[in-house]
Amino acid sequence: INVLGTVQMLEGARAGNIKKFVYAGSSSCYGLAKTPTTEDHHINPGYPYALSKYQGEMAALHWQKVYNLSVNSIRIFNAYGERVRTTGLYGAVFGVFLKQKLERTPFTVVGDGSQSRDFVYVSDVVRAFLAAAKTSRNGEVYNLGAGNPQTINYLVQLIGGDITYI
């Protein structure tokens, strides 16, 4: 879906004379990058989802070059807020912890919890997409995070509860 679905959307945007296509990229394309992570950081997708998101972004930017379709891409870091995912690995930690809190089970932390994540609230994601759609700039890639990475241990401390390190 991340590649073929994106290509279908790009073709639809091109056929429909859409003014701007904003691709929902992912920070996962960087792999386990040091923070802060800039847009020019080395791409190192460590698993199929990350690779497929990066390939979708490359397709969107290719349509920009080949078909002159106005495109921007936003590489979203760990989004949280209403309707947050409660399953998954890297990007779902906030939702997984909320589910564990509601179920009154210990937080499962992989490793020692010192690893950090950059979180961004869902309404900030919406604002970023609107800004990327309205800008006169095209062919741009933007990282979207709060710019203030937090450790997993700190996140658990904020939510409050017992921890099981695995």
What are these regions (language model features)?
Residues I1-E11, A15, K19-K20, S28-S73, ...:
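Catalytic helix-loop patch of NAD(P)-dependent Rossmann-fold dehydrogenases
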Residues V7, T87, G95, S123-V126, ...:
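Residues in well-ordered alpha-helical elements
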Residues G46, F77-Y90, G111-V122:
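Glycine-rich "substrate-gating" loop/helix at the edge of Rossmann-like oxidoreductase active sites
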Residues Q55, A59, W63, V93, ...:
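Hydrophobic alpha-helix immediately C-terminal to the catalytic Tyr-X-X-X-Lys motif of short-chain
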